[in-house]
């Protein structure tokens, strides 16, 4: 049975740890789908350290945008995080919010057609007030609308 869970909060608020704990409550063999773009060797080492710290029971997947490329049917999967996932589309579409949002929604719908338990982790970046930076305001809008869309599908 498909299930969508959305975990949101501020930066460093414990969202990922909470999501991992929730996944462990639901299965002994969870999937961790990380959406971060690996920019350099230092970050690659950080990713490897996080994978090792999660333990051997986890299936680790690195995927910047096309989550639906991965068959997670029948699994419990933590998607961490929506903010970085949106960033990847935002950069691909040259900061065009409408195009980015359309692509994110399309990929979300395609990915979540699978019969799985999806635990999406996202940041609430809009609580910090309105930025003076136009690019940041555009991204905050994209993030907020994406969070609303995922929340509308969540159980």
How should these model regions be labeled?
Residues 56-102:
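Helix-adjacent hinge/juxtasegments
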Residues 3-7, 30, 75-84, 116-120:
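Generic beta-sheet signal
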Residues 19, 50, 78, 123, ...:
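Residue-level signal for inorganic ion chemistry
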Residues 37-40, 83-84, 124-127:
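Conserved nucleotide-binding/hydrolysis micro-motifs of P-loop NTPases
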Residues 25, 57-73, 105-113, 145, ...:
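A short, N-terminal amphipathic alpha-helix
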Residues 4-71:
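Conserved P-loop
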Residues 1-4, 11, 73, 98-102, ...:
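Catalytic phosphate/metal-binding cores of nucleic-acid and nucleotide-processing enzymes, i.e., regions
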């Amino acid at each position: 049975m498909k299930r969508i869970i959305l975990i949101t909060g501020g930066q460093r608020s414990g969202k990922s740890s909470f999501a991992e704990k929730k996944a462990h409550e639901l299965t002994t063999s969870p999937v961790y789908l990380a959406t971060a773009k690996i920019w350099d060797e230092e970050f690659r080492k950080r990713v490897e350290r996080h994978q090792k710290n999660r333990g051997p029971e986890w299936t680790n997947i690195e995927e910047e945008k096309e989550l639906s490329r991965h068959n997670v049917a029948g699994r419990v999967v933590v998607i961490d995080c929506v903010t970085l996932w949106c960033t990847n589309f935002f950069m691909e579409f040259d900061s065009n919010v409408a195009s980015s949002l359309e692509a994110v929604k399309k990929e979300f719908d395609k990915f979540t057609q699978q019969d799985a338990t999806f635990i999406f982790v996202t940041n609430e970046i809009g609580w910090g007030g309105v930025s003076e930076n136009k690019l940041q305001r555009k991204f905050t809008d994209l993030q907020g609308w994406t969070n609303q869309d995922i929340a509308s599908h969540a159980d």
